[in-house]
Amino acid sequence: MQFIDEVKIHVQSGHGGAGCVSFRREKFIPFGGPNGGDGGRGGDVIFRVDSNLSTLLDLRYRPHLKAGSGKNGMGKDRHGAGGEDLVIPVPPGTIIKDAETGEILADLVTAGEEIVLLKGGRGGQGNARFATSTNRAPKFAQPGEPEEQRWLRLELKLLADVGLLGFPNVGKSSFITRVSAARPKIADYPFTTLKPNLGVVPYKNYRSFVIADIPGIIEGASEGAGLGHRFLKHVERTTVLLHVLDLSWMPDRDPIREYEALNRELALFSPELADKRQIVVVNKMDLPAVRENLPAVLPWFRERGLAVFPLSAATGEGISPLLDEIARSLWGKDEEEW
């Protein structure tokens, strides 16, 4: 399924039905009193979180959505039926903004959560409502209230506990495949990952956490280079970031310089994102070159108080200590301390 995380839509609530002008016309009562019914209320526009959805794809092809209008009132004091509400299902993590001002109108994260964003117009009152002692045969009724309408921008920010960051081809997709049931495309060329992937990582004592793998970030991403910058929003809700490094390219590529470059891109995108706790992961420990190069970079990270976890996504070496560290970051303790 195509991953769509931004759409612009126009929504409109229902118009209220008009009140009715009507009089009793019965045998032997040629000039009966007013009996016009009220118009029905217009339908509301409601956004509801559906945990079965993971993309805004459906809304991309339905940019104009409208609730049902209320029916007009009728004679014999019959009220018009209310218009059908427009219920728009969205995935967890959807942010709804005013398309013109950028104002955040709702941030929907919990399954079943809903918000009435536009109210339908009230139905007009029929002439039976206006009968008085001085005007027993009112020949007027209220029109229904008009609908509300608005252009909206919907943005999806995936809900994950852990964000997976790194330059292209450092083995992020291999890692998420190793620790979860997610199966992203894996190949030996840059930008194999073209969309965010979520994986549920089973931990101990029946606990688990969600990890998000986004396309690789490259230097200059904040100016539009590469693919990853537009997906950085999907790790904004995370608690901890895993920064994956590949030492197999040394000395042609400097992993410390790449680490600093990626963090500059984070800061340009969001200072809050750059301040999140990071765990440094050195992947591909199954390669002799990585084992040889590791001692050259460890002191730099340790001097800065950064935890470094060498591992191999290919063989599983070093995975368990990393998962324990993630557990401490998320819950304050690992399995041994429960």
UniProtKB/Swiss-Prot annotation:
Any one of the GO BP annotations: ribosome biogenesis
Record bears the keyword Metal-binding: yes
Cofactors: Mg(2+)
GO MF terms, alphabetically ordered: GTP binding; GTPase activity; magnesium ion binding
Sequence ranges assigned to domain Obg in this UniProt record: 1-159
EC number: 3.6.5.-
Residue sites binding GTP per the record: 166-173, 191-195, 213-216, 283-286, 312-314
Keywords assigned: Cytoplasm, GTP-binding, Hydrolase, Magnesium, Metal-binding, Nucleotide-binding
One Pfam family this sequence matches: MMR_HSR1
GO cellular component terms, semicolon-separated: cytoplasm
Residue intervals of the OBG-type G domain: 160-331
SUPFAM superfamilies for this protein: Obg GTP-binding protein N-terminal domain (SSF82051), P-loop containing nucleoside triphosphate hydrolases (SSF52540)
Subcellular location: Cytoplasm
Keyword Nucleotide-binding carried by entry: yes
Family indicated by similarity: Belongs to the TRAFAC class OBG-HflX-like GTPase superfamily. OBG GTPase family.
Name of this chain's protein: GTPase Obg
Source organism (scientific name): Geobacter sulfurreducens (strain ATCC 51573 / DSM 12127 / PCA)
